[in-house]
Amino acid sequence: LDALLTALPIAYLKWDHNRDLAPLADAAGRPSGTAQVAGTLALLARLRAAHPDVEIESCAGGGGRIDAGMAQHVHRFWTSDNIDALSRIAIQRGFLAFMPPEMMGSHVGASPAHATGRVQPMGFRAVVAMTGHLGVELDPAKLSEGERAALA
């Protein structure tokens, strides 16, 4: 990673690690999950020190990696791949109970939502996404004039 971040003009890194820790035990049968987490935090600390201008987002919803330890090393968290606005209200409420809004990646998604199939107006999707670090996860060229106006 250091070589890539040094050689290429990379400004953003998404750290995506889902829940499974492998292996769960070392060769002697001792639990190794704690060591794996400590290693991840140490690696991220080295990357941040060597590349302070690279923005790091932890994709943590599936990995259960939203905690104070990880927050020291990333700029924000992606809380869930479910970007259905109605579903995101509960997800974001839980996140905001212990983390600041600027650390929450929150995107306006397409309608119907890919995870639920729900159709929701652009205004609702945008307002829900604005509670965090706002992003747009759809093709703006496919929006109607009304949707573009609501998003703007």
Residue spans of the language-model regions?
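Short, intrinsically disordered, charge-balanced linker/junction segments flanking boundaries
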Residues: 147-152
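Active-site neighborhood of glycoside hydrolase catalytic domains
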Residues: 1-123, 133, 137-145
